[in-house]
């Protein structure tokens, strides 16, 4: 009698479409599905894959980070492409002239980019502008930037751990004695 094949782990876990029911996002997916199929550029495949992603995997990109990345050598006169949101950064004093394509741009970031003489494209305009992704720079925000990542890692309280504990309150009596000071048992 043969051993049956174990089928419980042979499902490939990856998105084939966005979870969102947003009709405008679905239209973009239709467009980039076509482009990914009909053009031989990896750019369109990457954009399509990122359109499927969950919101936590499409973190917002700040204006300052985008400016820093676009100042790198060889990136002059290129379009910054962000499959996500571009947010304003008040720490930036002057914004250079930028050409940007994003799913969303917050109102303050939008006004600052346009005031600097920049241009903001949507993804359907980008598809007409550069269908193969020529002259573009794909950027994304920091995925590990969310506060929740501070709680991940080595258990808090163990040596050399910088993991943030989940604490009810940040008061004097909460996780401040044993393991935090030498007079109370030990100090890590």
Swiss-Prot record:
One of its GO terms (biological process) is translation. GO terms for molecular function: RNA binding; structural constituent of ribosome. GO terms for cellular component: cytoplasm; cytosol; cytosolic large ribosomal subunit; cytosolic ribosome; endoplasmic reticulum; focal adhesion; membrane; nucleolus. The keyword Ribosomal protein applies. It comes from the Eukaryota. The keyword Kinase does not apply. This is Large ribosomal subunit protein eL18. Belongs to the eukaryotic ribosomal protein eL18 family. It is linked to Diamond-Blackfan anemia 18: A form of Diamond-Blackfan anemia, a congenital non-regenerative hypoplastic anemia that usually presents early in infancy. Diamond-Blackfan anemia is characterized by a moderate to severe macrocytic anemia, erythroblastopenia, and an increased risk of malignancy. 30 to 40% of Diamond-Blackfan anemia patients present with short stature and congenital anomalies, the most frequent being craniofacial (Pierre-Robin syndrome and cleft palate), thumb and urogenital anomalies. DBA18 inheritance is autosomal dominant.
